[in-house]
């Protein structure tokens, strides 16, 4: 009996169940024994892979004693959604930057094409546990290309404003960054807020 909706079908792949790393002291029987296979939805497999990667890098969000880099900051900051899609008619896309870290952060937004896109705010500070709305506007243009928006992040010391923090650290500390894709299509449908 065939399903009337193909949207309910999910692609499947296979995954090997492995108990962990094997040592060089295995018997020949252990080496030649096949590992069991299970069927798993590809979306579930992608989720598992993302979870495994994030758990391996979760230690980056905590600064080690003597650390002067800013890579730990980016691990505590997320931007949702990570892609802004526009038609050639332009429009507005709203995103949320969330600070999950324990530190106050300064943010500076840069774009690969400042003539095509306007971003608000350009500079901002975000307190720990708070979020910031990012508004990205694209002008009407027949030019179809992929651009990039970069969220530059520095730890904010004291009560200084973001512009002052970035100016002070211009030659001493490189900011952490999160890149976002800005995509324009010839499709007249509204693509805003999709990932």
Swiss-Prot record:
Gene3D superfamilies: Immunoglobulins (2.60.40.10). Residues 76-184 form the MSP domain. InterPro entries: Ig-like_fold (IPR013783), MSP_dom (IPR000535), PapD-like_sf (IPR008962), Sperm-specific_class_P (IPR051774). It comes from the Eukaryota. Residues 20-30 have a biased composition (Low complexity). Residues 1-35 are annotated as: Disordered. It holds the Pfam family Motile_Sperm. PANTHER family: MAJOR SPERM PROTEIN, PROTEIN CBG16675. This is Uncharacterized protein D2007.2. It comes from Caenorhabditis elegans.
